Amino acid sequence: MAGQEDPVQREIHQDWANREYIEIITSSIKKIADFLNSFDMSCRSRLATLNEKLTALERRIEYIEARVTKGETLT
């Protein structure tokens, strides 16, 4: 009887080891996904801020170019 339980016990232990391994991999994938989502949001926010600053600079340049073209003083 003990000889029949040994392979079963080994299978049970192997199954638990596999489940633990899968849990570790799943947890790691979730952490990576969370990091990537956070990184994406951070990059989008920074790019939006940069875009606003560039747009404001472009408007100022266009305004200054228009004044220079008309011969107005910039003071």
Swiss-Prot record:
Residues 41-72 form a coiled coil. It comes from Homo sapiens. This is Protein BRICK1. Involved in regulation of actin and microtubule organization. Part of a WAVE complex that activates the Arp2/3 complex. As component of the WAVE1 complex, required for BDNF-NTRK2 endocytic trafficking and signaling from early endosomes. GO terms for molecular function: identical protein binding; protein-containing complex binding. The modification N-acetylalanine is found at A2. Keywords: Acetylation, Coiled coil, Cytoplasm, Cytoskeleton. Transmembrane segments: none annotated. Homotrimer when in free form. Directly interacts with WASF2. Component of the WAVE1 complex composed of ABI2, CYFIP1 or CYFIP2, BRK1, NCKAP1 and WASF1/WAVE1. Within the complex, a heterodimer containing NCKAP1 and CYFIP1 interacts with a heterotrimer formed by WAVE1, ABI2 and BRK1.
